[in-house]
Amino acid sequence: MKRTYQPSKIKRQRTHGFRARISTIGGKRVIAARRSKGRVRLTV
């Protein structure tokens, strides 16, 4: 049986990257929440 997680840097960035987050309203909220919390890494 094939495992569910097949790592790919491109797919990771396109789905969870900064530009992907900023492009949606919900994503902007995620970034804002992480900024307010003081996270060092905002995305991925």
UniProtKB/Swiss-Prot annotation:
Q: Does the keyword Ribosomal protein apply?
A: yes
Question: Coiled-coil ranges per the record?
Answer: none
Q: Name one GO biological process term.
A: translation
- Single GO MF descriptor: structural constituent of ribosome
Q: Which InterPro entries match?
A: Ribosomal_bL34, Ribosomal_bL34_CS
Please tell me whether the keyword Ribonucleoprotein is annotated for this protein: yes
| GO cellular component labels | ribonucleoprotein complex; ribosome
Task: Keywords in alphabetical order, please.
Answer: Ribonucleoprotein, Ribosomal protein
TM regions (residue ranges): none
Superkingdom assignment:
Bacteria
Q: Which PANTHER family match?
A: LARGE RIBOSOMAL SUBUNIT PROTEIN BL34M, MITOCHONDRIAL RIBOSOMAL PROTEIN 34 FAMILY MEMBER
The record's comment on protein family reads: Belongs to the bacterial ribosomal protein bL34 family.
Specify the protein name: Large ribosomal subunit protein bL34
